[in-house]
Amino acid sequence: MLDIKFLRENPEIVKENIKKKFQDEKLVLVDEAIELDEKLRQEKNKGDELRAQRNKTSKEIGALMGQKKIDEAEAAKAKVKEINEALVQIEEDTKKFEAELKERMLVIPQIIDESVPVGKDDSENVEVEKYGEPVVPEYEVPYHVEIMESFDGIDLDAARDTSGAGFYYLRGDIARLHSSILSYARDFMIDRGYTYYIPPFMIRSEVVTGVMSFAEMENMMYKIEGEDLYLIGTSEHSMIGKFINTITDEEKMPLRMTSYSPCFRKEVGAHGIEERGVYRIHQFEKQEMVIICKPEDSMNFYNELWKNTVDFFRSLEIPVRTLECCSGDLADLKVKSVDVEAWSPRQKKYFEVGSCSNLGDAQARRLGIKLRGEEGTYLAHTLNNTVVAPPRMLIAFLENLLQEDGSVKIPEPLRMYMGGKDKIVPVK
């Protein structure tokens, strides 16, 4: 959410930003917000003036009564009553204008960084750099579910019976591999100086609307019926929410956190052949990174975050690339974002395995996350990035480390979590 003062003083900048995001239908919101802001300030000024008059008149009543000027005192009382009635209406109008203004401000997008490439959608995202050599082996790489089934490691049919489409049972070596990757990711981030958290897996609506746009909320979040609680789509939601309405001394910055959680997503609109199997699912687990920092440091930490993911995947011998998200692909709260994509030997292309985002002060403004410095308090900046999100990451892992005999190589960093195994062998 933008600062209303910034919008008031820079409406053309805000409108140009909306155009860059190809959301021209929102242009009218800028003028509406400015008009509502003016009405709101007028009402507040009228209220202040009337309260001052009321205070002055109330003092006069006592003096008039002391002078036995009863008629004048009664007239003053009537005036106070009239002012009170006017103030009631002003307070109602003020609340109405505040609500209408907030409604518009919440959907006006954050100002994107000037380095963000302009494009309509994800088809216009820009490749930044490749890490590792993408290899297509001479032998066939089966579909990831077939690889898992060769280890007797997945049961989609039973999951459909218990839960419906978009769920799965993992078992045996595949389940152990899944858990081992998460354990390695946890320790990988702890070794890089991040504090490990396991947060709540449900959050209140106040936090939901603080950490994401309404469009994201509608497409992602599952609501708990009868309660003001939502299942989280990522632990970023809980971790940022942890700091709602807080003021932290700036010398404690940055706060580097890494958090584990299950994630629950509707995945509205998911479709296509690669949505089969465990590519897009309603429930998965993830290790996340979250940073809260001073505004001037956020771009440096943004680069630190995506590099962590690249280093993690490369430590497991998986080729990846970074893809700069264009203006039209950025969610409304994001200032800048880069996807990390892993190589798929079977598909002969890259696919997303993580997303790194700098949200500037958008979440901090919505949630009241402030820092305290020598010159007073100010809004923090928030950033997040995926370390790893199996089972999607398992697709990249199994395809890239599959051997010709059907076994899967276990890279050295992962072996201590897999009981010392240097490979897992299919049972079918």
Residue ranges, per PLM feature:
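N-terminal alpha-helical targeting/anchoring segments
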Residues: 1-134, 149, 153
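TRNA-recognition modules of translation machinery and tRNA-sensing kinases, especially anticodon-binding
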Residues: 27, 130-428
